[in-house]
């Protein structure tokens, strides 16, 4: 879709974590070498989320994207809260910002310019459908979680 449009981004901005793999694929497909990421926490589980999305450090330095044509990439536009936060941040600094997602839900606040499919259902992606293989222990490094044979 993006490749067949007249939009030629100078920067691909992937939203971590769900948008990292689609952003990398998009960067290769469009031959864009400048790839950045922005970590945003919003979802804490299946259909569980914080009240508002929060940008996590390290924050993207606006000087790195100043004046650029940016394509923001994520896996899904569910409520659109994450994309709105990132798009609003970019809009203050860049020449143009557009969004690309694999899936867009009808309730999304942001209507993305590039959408592979639209759905009202929960989407499970291969990179996020399984539980983490490590657990966080307070004050310690990550500890491996035993993987059962039924995974």
Q: What do the predicted segments below correspond to?
A:
Residues 1-151:
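PRPP-associated nucleotide enzymes
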